From Swiss-Prot:
Reaction catalysed by this enzyme: 6-(2-amino-2-carboxyethyl)-7,8-dioxo-1,2,3,4,7,8-hexahydroquinoline-2,4-dicarboxylate + 3 O2 = pyrroloquinoline quinone + 2 H2O2 + 2 H2O + H(+)
Name assigned to this protein: Pyrroloquinoline-quinone synthase
Family affiliation: Belongs to the PqqC family.
Pathway linked to the protein: Cofactor biosynthesis; pyrroloquinoline quinone biosynthesis
Keywords assigned by UniProt, alphabetized: Oxidoreductase, PQQ biosynthesis
Biological source species: Acidiphilium cryptum (strain JF-5)
Database matches in Pfam families: TENA_THI-4
Top enzyme category: oxidoreductase
């Protein structure tokens, strides 16, 4: 039988999910950060990850649309501002596109998502659908991977700067803002989950939501590894298929 945990025990259980399943443990990230990939493989990472970036504000708008809690909406809408900016040329999506262009990718190709891996699109879509279809508590809990992102972002920026001559500090500027935004967002979401998960079932649902989200991130890296590292099977239509790297 599942027992009711204290809020701090719940937090510990959530952190244990991240320790076991967060995407910092994925071999593709270890290759990426360790300088073991060539430029095309890094380009593949950037253009696939664009799909995730582009979906994040859609899932945040979905969450906002679902709640009648005005305070939650007010706080959550900062995430839309962070990703979309307040005027053209601002925000995380634009900064991600600058990263992709800094790697030599064509901006319109990246935005079109037509060269992304099928599994990337499916994983990203699953996240948006989850936030639309599950309870609000699960929707908020699914964002909690951000508790773990500052560490991986620091590792990524220092590793990529040290190991690739085609990467500059400007290319990676996207991540600077995330180092402030992610802890702020995660602190709020964690507090929300600790206050609103009041039954054993709700607590287990929150843990399962975070597990699901780790799977969303992991699946995207599995797809990259399968296509671009080993066995190197690039799906039809995807970046690099038939030797076309554009
Ligand atoms: O670089 C990363 O490893 C990483 C991880 C995550 C995450 O853990 O979901 C996010 C981000 N970056 C990120 O940049 C971002 O905007 C973001 C939003 C969310 C979310 O679930 O709402 N996760 C993440």
């Amino acid at each position: 039988m599942t027992v009711l945990m204290s809020p701090d025990e719940l937090e510990a259980a959530l952190r244990a999910v991240g320790a076991a399943r967060y995407h910092n443990r994925h071999p593709f990230h270890q290759l990426l950060h360790g300088g073991k990939l060539d430029k095309r493989q890094v380009q593949a990472w950037a253009l696939n990850r664009y799909c995730y970036q582009a979906a994040i504000p859609i899932k945040d708008a979905t969450l906002i649309a679902r709640t009648d809690d005005s305070e939650l909406r007010r706080i959550w809408r900062q995430r839309l501002v962070d990703h979309d900016g307040t005027q053209p040329g601002e925000g995380g999506i634009v900064r991600w596109l600058a990263l992709a262009e800094g790697l030599g990718l064509d901006r319109d190709m990246v935005i079109s998502e037509r060269r992304a891996l099928p599994a990337t699109r499916f994983a990203v879509r699953a996240y948006v659908d989850f936030v639309r279809d599950r309870s609000l508590l699960e929707a908020v809990a699914s964002s909690l991977t951000e508790m773990f992102s500052p560490t991986i972002i620091s590792e990524r920026v220092s590793g990529m700067l040290a190991n690739y001559d085609f990467i500059t500090r400007e290319t990676l500027a996207y991540f600077n803002a995330r180092l402030d935004q992610a802890p702020r967002d995660a602190d709020f979401a964690l507090d929300y989950v600790k206050r609103h998960a009041r039954t054993p079932e709700q607590q287990q649902a929150a843990i399962a939501a975070l597990t699901f989200k780790c799977d969303v991130l992991w699946a995207q890296l599995d797809a990259l590894h399968h296509a671009y590292v080993s066995p190197g099977l690039i799906p039809p239509g995807a970046f690099g298929h038939d030797g076309i790297w554009s």
